[in-house]
């Protein structure tokens, strides 16, 4: 009689031999992280939707992520690269201050939870349930997990490359993770890039969100948002004419001009100055709708200029962002060049978390100064936003500390006040000025912290 133990031994030995061959032929990297994020808000008011009164909302998350990246070509091949990766994250709300809140103006509407917005938001891939689900239903249908990485990446030298699947996005107007593809071709000092997205996801300690269509307006088909860049760059200047578009919704031509002293000025100083302009042009049917209580209209424009200065361990800078018309109605709230400078989504989740930075005809002024001390970064920043709908002011300080090699800590305090002008109301976006809405002033100050262990 055949001994099954011998067979099992041979199978395992064969598997180990193949595993050893694979390790010798290919490279791979395993990375993981566990962490927690918290936002403790100072405003824990009741909800009164009739008056436009809402709390800021406090919450605490716990998250864990695992990722594996492979190089699929033998180690001896130098000019060609072929990569594959898979990664996912799961999380939960350890605390949610909004879980059992009731609307004073409409008690029969049931509980009004809101922090599912950060941990597991899911209203359908096409956002088809955003209007017909209650807040409680949205909390019940939350998906605090996502397979954020599943990609194939080919590159020939620095001349040509293509990447497709799910992977981290570096696109100007898409933060988080992309579900789509991109490619580039370089010739001398020119580089052409194409980017297509059919889904966006978030995966970090603060937010988990499964892939959804980043732009889809009253359509049952996602046509994708697309981008073409033509980049010219030398050691003095970078010039990028570009266009972003979504079929049947909008076309947004624009350009970037950047001057950076890093490549030619050998000094303790580094000065980077960038100017962006883009011009969203909306379709006829979209132009008749409202975004953040303002008519979208046909034409709009956005100007953004910033300057960053580094001197030894110091850094400081400023920026100005100006909306002409309703430029953010389709492009910008899924990511924008502003994102590295300050958080544009730190309002109450009852306002979709978006700050008044996105309002029509708004102007936002920002400044910061910081210093690095070994593994500690301290940064002071301020932000002023003015718009017909609302004004806001914030002043905050952030501490970031890398403890040893794998542990990262962050602590932030932000004093933040929003004045909603007469005629507008928090959380009300579907029509324009209404004289029955009274002015409100609400405190949106918060304390944020995060900790993570990564390897």
Role assignments for model-derived ranges:
Residues 159-171, 176, 181, 192-196, ...:
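Transmembrane beta-strand segments that form the barrel wall of outer-membrane beta-barrel proteins
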């Amino acid at each position: 009689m055949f001994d099954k133990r011998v067979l099992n031994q041979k199978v395992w030995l064969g598997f180990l031999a193949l595993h050893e061959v694979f390790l010798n032929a290919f490279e791979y990297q395993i990375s993981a992280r566990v962490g927690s994020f918290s936002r403790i808000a100072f405003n824990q008011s009741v909800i009164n939707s009739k008056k436009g009164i809402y709390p800021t909302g406090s919450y605490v998350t716990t998250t864990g992520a695992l990722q594996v990246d492979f190089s699929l070509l033998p180690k001896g091949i130098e000019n060609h690269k072929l990569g594959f990766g898979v990664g996912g994250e799961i999380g939960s709300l350890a605390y949610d201050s909004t879980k059992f809140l009731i609307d004073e103006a409409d008690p029969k509407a049931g509980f009004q939870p809101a922090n599912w917005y950060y941990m597991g938001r899911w209203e359908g891939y096409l956002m088809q349930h955003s209007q017909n689900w209650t807040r409680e239903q949205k909390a019940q249908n939350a998906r605090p997990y996502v397979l954020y990485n599943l990609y194939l990446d080919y590159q020939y030298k620095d001349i040509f490359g293509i990447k497709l699947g799910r992977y981290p996005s570096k696109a100007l107007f898409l933060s988080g993770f992309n579900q789509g593809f991109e490619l580039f071709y370089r010739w001398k000092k020119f580089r052409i890039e194409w980017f297509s997205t059919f889904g966006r996801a978030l995966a970090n300690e603060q937010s988990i969100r499964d892939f959804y269509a980043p732009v889809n307006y009253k359509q049952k088909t996602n046509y994708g948002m697309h981008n073409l860049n033509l980049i010219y760059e030398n050691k003095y200047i970078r010039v990028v004419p570009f266009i972003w578009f979504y079929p049947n919704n909008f076309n947004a031509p624009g350009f970037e001009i950047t001057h950076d002293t890093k490549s030619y000025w050998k000094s303790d100083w580094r000065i980077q100055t960038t100017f962006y302009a883009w011009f969203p042009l909306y379709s006829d049917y979209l132009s008749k709708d409202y975004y953040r209580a303002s008519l979208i209209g046909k034409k709009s424009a956005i100007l953004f200029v910033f300057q960053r200065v580094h001197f030894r361990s110091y850094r400081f800078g400023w920026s100005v962002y100006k909306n002409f018309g309703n430029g953010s109605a389709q492009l910008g709230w899924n990511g924008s060049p502003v994102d590295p400078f300050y958080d544009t989504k730190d309002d109450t989740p009852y306002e979709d978390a978006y700050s008044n930075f996105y309002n029509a005809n708004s102007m936002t002024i920002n400044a910061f100064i910081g210093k690095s001390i070994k593994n500690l970064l301290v940064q002071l920043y301020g932000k002023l936003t003015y718009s017909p709908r609302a004004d806001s002011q914030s002043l905050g300080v952030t501490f970031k500390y890398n403890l040893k090699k794998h542990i990262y800590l962050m602590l932030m305090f932000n004093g933040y006040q929003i004045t909603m002008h007469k005629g507008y109301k928090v959380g009300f976006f579907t029509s324009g000025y209404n004289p029955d809405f009274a002015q409100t002033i609400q405190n949106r100050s918060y304390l944020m912290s995060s900790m993570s262990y990564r390897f």
